[in-house]
UniProtKB/Swiss-Prot annotation:
The keyword tRNA processing does not apply. The keyword Glycoprotein applies. This is Uncharacterized transporter ESBP6. It is found in: Endoplasmic reticulum membrane. SUPFAM superfamilies: MFS general substrate transporter (SSF103473). GO terms for cellular component: cell periphery; endoplasmic reticulum; endoplasmic reticulum membrane; mitochondrion; plasma membrane. Belongs to the major facilitator superfamily. Monocarboxylate porter (TC 2.A.1.13) family. It comes from Saccharomyces cerevisiae (strain ATCC 204508 / S288c). Glycans are attached at residues 230, 471, 492. Pfam families: MFS_1.
Length: 673
């Protein structure tokens, strides 16, 4: 067996040292004398040609060194990306990389039932459900156990099993083996734990289509009528600020109402998720729809400021969370491989709703001269569209509600949702901080754009048009973000988009004064400003284990919610009305600084993610090297594989080395992550 020592890092180190020696030799040469005599003395032509030749050879050598260095880096990155692509067909890897709240709920429910029964769960694959080679080994015939009848359960467990698994209790161990039924093991893949139908004991993978597209349309409607409608509040805010609608109200009051809806929408998400597990999905959404209708209708009759706080602030915020959170849990049950596409289509609702309700709100305000009929029409239209979504929404494998009869079961749901163990994981805290800064800047920019346009001398119609363009760009940008994240890496895409947003805030928004300039700004920013909303869930899935996903998701939502409450209040406090040239300059700078903070945090998260992935691959490489040493191969292919493993070992040892230089090297290492 021969070994290859020409790995890329050792070669590159030699090249860099060679370059350094050449540069040092140039720097250590005799200094040039600039005396009059030396200037006047003629230089022989042969010396000039020799000097030019030496300079050219040095430049050529440096150029070759850099070229070889870049080629070696490209080779290393391609090797890592190839290893990532090798797992792209593994259904279990796909699920873990796209893990969602609905998957976490099903996993929690299945494990809860399993612990209560204290019996092995039976699994069988349905027709058409296929796994890739890495996952299918768990379901092969060799994993089937013949002695399932040897398990001794209590009488209560037997009775519950007869109710849940009537088919499996009618067969002997040999009959179960013939059906392809296996016992549940602790190290089973996540896809088996999540998509096992508890009523039949069968593994049922999502169909990636069919009625799932109707469900996608339903989620689109809920996003259209909740966050999409709320995105048009910037038009209402501009109207309230420019008209004395509620005597005695300050700009901070209206700003606080704007922040209240976003604050409650994020803060209540974990509580709504627990409520849905207790009373059921449809009941929760119907309750939220009723609250929404009442909120807008009551807001249209308000005459005092506190009434507006209660209706358009508190009640609307609660209704948004009660409607959209349960709806988003249905979609993952219908899609797995096409989940990013389905999620992207459903997210179109936020941007589309902002366009429609933004333009409609401005039109109704100009026609009616007040917000009364505007709020009534919005409330009725939103509640009807949500009712349509509830009627058509269908869970593929519904998780039964636990009901109100068991306080202990309800407490267990809250305990699982608000587990404080996730705080001990620093990367979860980093995700929460990143999400807070990015969402803070997003809301500040969205709610301020309309008022900023009016301060620059534009009409209210132009201001609402800018808001509509911004939301329309979001409807295109958000689906593309999800697809780009799956192709190029979530952290990579997030860093690129956050960098662009930082540039747009400082280099485009501040100098933009005309309507045309603000149109282009709205298009550019709208295409990438929703990056936090799109990427927060998948980044959590990349960082935590499936069993820890639910409390981590809850923590990310409620951790940054209080800051969203005062988001627009801070924007108004930073406004300098005496500065006629640009009263929102300080708010714009603060918004850009928030994106800078988000960029720093996501860069730290990227380094951590790369370190985890490289550490895992380093361990796998070392294990394979041990296996190769223990075995004997004398073929060309074996020799080639040995060389590749040695190159990988050297690469991982270098990248995972200690020191600040290695830390930043991992941070900028251009692999898909």
């Amino acid at each position: 067996m021969s070994t290859h020592s020409n790995d890329y890092f050792s070669a590159s180190s030699g090249m860099v040292s060679e370059t350094s020696s050449e540069v040092s030799s140039i720097n250590s040469s005799q200094p040039v004398s600039f005396s009059k005599a030396s200037i006047a003395a003629p230089v022989p032509c042969s010396d000039l040609h020799s000097t030019k030749s030496n300079d050219a050879s040095r430049k050529l050598s440096i150029s070759r060194t850099l070229t070889n260095r870049l080629n070696d880096i490209k080779k290393a990155v391609d090797d890592d990306n190839l290893q990532t692509e090798e797992n792209s067909a593994d259904v279990n890897k796909i699920l873990e990389s796209r893990f969602d709240v609905a998957d976490a709920i099903r996993l929690q429910h299945n494990e809860s039932v399993q612990s209560k029964l204290n019996i092995p769960v039976t699994h069988t694959t349905t027709a058409g459900a296929s796994l890739s080679a890495p996952s299918s080994s768990a379901f092969s015939a060799s994993s089937i156990q013949n002695d399932t009848t040897e398990h001794k359960a209590s009488m209560d467990s037997k009775l519950m099993r007869n109710r849940l698994y009537p088919a499996s209790t009618k067969h002997s161990g040999k009959d179960l083996e013939a059906q392809g039924i296996t016992e549940f093991e602790p190290d089973e893949p996540t896809v088996k734990k999540v998509f096992t139908n508890k009523s039949t004991g069968q593994l049922e993978l999502p169909p990636d289509g069919g009625y799932g597209w109707v469900v996608t349309f339903c989620v689109f409607l809920t996003m259209f009528s909740t966050w999409g409608c709320n995105a048009s509040f910037g038009v209402d805010l501009a109207y309230y600020l420019n008209h004395d609608t509620y005597p005695g109200a300050s700009k901070y009051d209206y700003a606080l109402i704007a922040g209240l809806t976003v604050f409650l929408g994020q803060l209540l998400s974990p509580l709504v998720m627990a409520l849905m597990r207790i009373i059921g999905l449809r009941t929760t959404m119907l309750f939220g729809d009723a609250v929404m209708l009442a909120a807008y209708l009551l807001a249209s009759f308000t005459t005092k400021l506190w009434q507006l706080y209660v209706t358009q602030g508190f009640m609307v915020g609660c209704s948004i969370s009660l409607i959209f959170v349960p709806a988003t849990t249905v979609l993952p049950g219908w899609f797995l491989k096409k989940r990013a596409v389905a999620m992207g289509v459903s997210l179109l609702g936020t941007g589309a709703g902002g366009v429609v309700y933004g333009l409609a709100t401005n039109k109704m305000l100009s026609d009616f001269g007040n917000t009364r009929w505007c709020l009534r029409i919005i409330g009725i239209s939103c509640s009807i569209s949500v009712l349509v979504a509830i009627a058509l929404l269908k869970e593929r494998n519904p998780t039964p509600a636990i009901g109100l009869k068991s306080p202990r079961a309800m407490f267990e749901q809250l305990k699982a949702m608000f587990s404080l163990k996730v705080i001990t994981k620093p990367f979860v805290v980093l995700i929460a901080l990143w999400f807070m800064f990015a969402l803070f800047a997003y809301n500040m920019m969205v709610f301020t754009l309309s008022s900023y346009a009016i301060s620059k001398g534009l009409s209210s119609h132009d201001a609402s048009t800018l808001t509509a363009i911004l939301n329309g760009s979001q409807s295109i940008g958000r689906p593309l973000m999800g697809l780009a994240g799956d192709k190029f890496g979530r952290a990579n895409v997030t860093i690129v988009l956050t960098t662009l947003l930082t540039i747009y805030m400082f280099a485009f928004w501040i100098p933009a004064h005309t309507f045309v300039q603000l149109i282009f700004f709205s298009i550019l920013v709208g295409s990438c400003v929703g990056v936090a909303n799109v990427m927060n869930t998948v980044l959590i899935a990349d960082m935590v284990k499936p069993e820890e996903f639910l409390p981590a998701w809850a923590f990310v939502n409620y951790c940054g919610a209080p800051f969203l409450l005062v988001c627009e209040v801070i924007a108004q406090a930073l406004t300098v009305e005496k500065d006629k040239s640009n009263p929102y300059l300080h708010a714009q700078i603060f918004c850009g600084c928030c994106f800078i903070a988000a960029l720093i945090l996501i860069s730290i998260l990227r380094e951590y993610s790369i370190r985890m992935k490289l550490t895992e691959r380093q361990a796998m490489t070392n294990e394979k090297l041990k296996e190769w040493k223990a075995s004997e191969y004398d073929t060309d292919s074996a020799d080639e594989d040995w060389g590749k493993l040695k190159e990988r070992k050297t690469k991982y040892d270098l990248l995972l080395g200690p020191g600040i230089k290695k830390y930043f090297l991992r941070m900028v290492y251009p692999m898909k992550v």
